[in-house]
């Protein structure tokens, strides 16, 4: 009997990607985050769709429509908080996924890595425009401050900002177009994720050792489908823990105050997952310099394959590089903390030192340490 799974044009694609896919036998739980990101995206699209059914993208009614969702719509509150906290889970998985790629040298798959960096930028853009939609104080002022950064671009900056705003300030036109962007971008993310997977399956997955696993492959199903389901259960457990017990833990209280252009909040800050980049932006006194540093903090990931000087792919057998990697993680946590603090002593100097260290580790120390390790191994 002919197996439809292996012959049907559509089923064949699914089969080759998720069922009969040859996978390395030794990939650890750090390889779970790709599937978790897929689940996060599906969850965000579904909850977002139901929220969009009740949301109105007008400055007069946006805030009250979100209140209406929470108070009057059946299970509206849980949908809203699953969407808001789902974004946080999305970014936790993203950071883990990127960290895994850096640690185990997955960036040597050039196309997969570069599509991944584009995906990271797209997800960040989606989260930013989404944060503006509830039209609270932090939504309004966050949108004003971040879009204003584009005015640092020489010559065309001011015109560009007014073009994005659709006027001379963040107003009705801005909110409407941000809602449109927020609706379309997740589908672009889904398409990019498919391209990401397509390129990954050209080469096959990396593994913790960083060496070829062609000699020892196992089918993706049932081994890794079961493993992914366990990861998904953990993800849903932690998400629901957040949603049901501390839904506002990661949010800003200022966003429960309707947007008011005449009243600036004492501390304007983005959501927690952008704080590291925000701290780097604030650590440079010059506006254009700050914007360049902000963009570079993510764009530097594109350079990772060029900065790889080690003869080994993975950090698994490179203790000095491992130490440096964990210093980088600690540095990013420090930047995240600083991004949420007011601009005053000693936070300014800590932020500046942490920002310098961030670029120093990636651009200078990593390649040097890798070369030293090569010499120690007599390669």
From Swiss-Prot:
Subcellular location: Mitochondrion inner membrane
Entry-linked CDD domains: cytochrome_b_C, Cytochrome_b_N
Binding site for heme b b562: 83, 182
TM ranges: 33-53, 77-98, 113-133, 178-198, 226-246, 288-308, 320-340, 347-367
Source organism, top-level taxon: Eukaryota
Any one GO cellular component localisation term in the record: mitochondrial inner membrane
Main location (coarse class): mitochondrion
Record InterPro entries: Cyt_b/b6_C (IPR005798), Cyt_b/b6_C_sf (IPR036150), Cyt_b/b6_N (IPR005797), Cytb/b6-like_sf (IPR027387), Cytochrome_b (IPR030689), Cytochrome_b_C_euk/bac (IPR048260), Cytochrome_b_N_euk/bac (IPR048259), Di-haem_cyt_TM (IPR016174)
GO biological process terms held by the UniProt record: mitochondrial electron transport, ubiquinol to cytochrome c
Annotated positions binding heme b b566: 97, 196
Coiled-coil segments: none
PROSITE patterns xref list: CYTB_CTER, CYTB_NTER
Subunit structure: The cytochrome bc1 complex contains 11 subunits: 3 respiratory subunits (MT-CYB, CYC1 and UQCRFS1), 2 core proteins (UQCRC1 and UQCRC2) and 6 low-molecular weight proteins (UQCRH/QCR6, UQCRB/QCR7, UQCRQ/QCR8, UQCR10/QCR9, UQCR11/QCR10 and a cleavage product of UQCRFS1). This cytochrome bc1 complex then forms a dimer.
Sequence similarity: Belongs to the cytochrome b family.
Additional observations: Heme 1 (or BL or b562) is low-potential and absorbs at about 562 nm, and heme 2 (or BH or b566) is high-potential and absorbs at about 566 nm.
Function: Component of the ubiquinol-cytochrome c reductase complex (complex III or cytochrome b-c1 complex) that is part of the mitochondrial respiratory chain. The b-c1 complex mediates electron transfer from ubiquinol to cytochrome c. Contributes to the generation of a proton gradient across the mitochondrial membrane that is then used for ATP synthesis.
Protein name: Cytochrome b
Lineage, opening ranks: Eukaryota, Metazoa, Chordata, Craniata, Vertebrata
